[in-house]
Structures are given as structure tokens and as C-alpha cells.
Design a protein with these regions (language model features):
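Catalytic cores of nuclease domains that cleave nucleic-acid phosphodiester backbones
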Residues: 1-45, 70-76
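Metal-dependent nuclease catalytic regions and adjoining charged, substrate-binding loops involved
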Residues: 8, 49-54, 64-155
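Residue-level detector of short, conserved catalytic/binding motifs and their immediate flanks
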Residues: 23, 60, 142
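Amphipathic alpha-helical segments in well-structured domains
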Residues: 55-59
């Protein structure tokens, strides 16, 4: 749990907003450094399947929490990848650092919280500005339930 200061002009209540996230595992090594561990499954383990998490909001959030919980004794984030296809294997390594992204991530959270406050109380989901993304609008399991509504509007 982290309390993040609100942006100037944010209409939400209080001086901070709550940001929560759940880690798979949090450990301390023999030198006393704290690590946040996340488990991921994959059909292949390559350097690109590791690097894709470097700028992921989930992992940037882990770094925010790790720094808050452990301070200078934060070791980082460990990704424990388990290969599902034969031959089965696993790979455990620390995530590449992204210090600028971690700094910017807090600002992104503030911006999102400000946007949520701005549009709170609207009647329907279509009263919000849409977010257009091939990752959101049409995922690997098919289109979002509002895909056609975003395409054509409410006719």
C-alpha cells in the first residue's frame, strides 16, 4: 500500500490517494536486501520475454513499493519464469533497472488518479474519453465488450 500525493488541481478527497498492489513473494537475502519476486509462465524463455517486463506498470509498481518498504536495502525485482512446454525449465533473474521509468510511473499514477476524479459520477462508460489500444480494444482472447460501441457509437 502506498499513499501518493495528489496533483495540483486534482478534485479527489484528501492530500493523497491509495495505490495498492500484491506481490507473489517478498524475501530478504543473506545480506539483508529485500526483493520482490513475481512468477510468470511462458511457452519459451528468451531475453525478449524478460525485457518486456522492464517498463510494465506491474513491475514499475513493484519498484515503487520496494523502495518504500526497504529503502536503500531494496535489491530489486526478481522474475521467476517457468516454461510450460517440454522440455520444462525455469529461469530466475533480476529485472533490468529503469530508474527514469519508476520516477515517471509515479507521475503517471497521479495523472490517472486525477483523470478518475475528473470523470467520477458520470452516467455511463461512454461518458469517459476512450482509450484506443490494440492491447486493450482487441486482446489475445478477442475484442473488448465495448469494441463495436467504440467503433460506431451508441446508435
Amino acid at each position: 500500500v502506498a499513499h501518493i500525493p495528489r496533483m495540483e488541481g486534482d478534485t479527489g478527497e484528501g492530500d493523497t490517494f491509495l495505490y495498492t498492489q500484491r506481490a507473489d513473494l517478498i524475501v530478504r537475502d543473506v545480506q539483508g536486501f529485500g526483493w520482490i519476486v513475481d512468477h510468470k509462465t511462458a511457452y519459451r524463455i528468451t531475453s525478449s520475454t524478460l525485457r518486456q517486463y522492464c517498463l510494465s506498470g506491474q513491475f514499475l509498481g513493484y519498484q515503487v513499493f520496494g523502495r518504500k518498504m526497504f529503502g536503500a536495502k531494496f535489491g530489486g525485482v526478481i522474475l521467476n519464469r517457468v516454461k510450460l512446454a517440454a522440455p520444462h525449465q525455469f529461469d530466475r533473474c533480476s529485472l533490468e533497472p529503469a530508474p527514469q521509468a519508476v520516477t515517471d510511473f509515479v507521475g503517471t499514477l497521479k495523472e490517472i488518479e486525477s483523470r478518475i476524479s475528473k470523470y467520477a459520477g458520470r452516467e455511463t462508460g461512454m461518458d469517459f474519453p476512450p482509450v484506443f489500444s490494440d492491447q486493450t480494444c482487441y486482446g489475445k482472447y478477442g475484442p473488448c465488450p465495448a469494441f463495436e460501441l467504440c467503433r460506431w457509437g451508441d446508435e
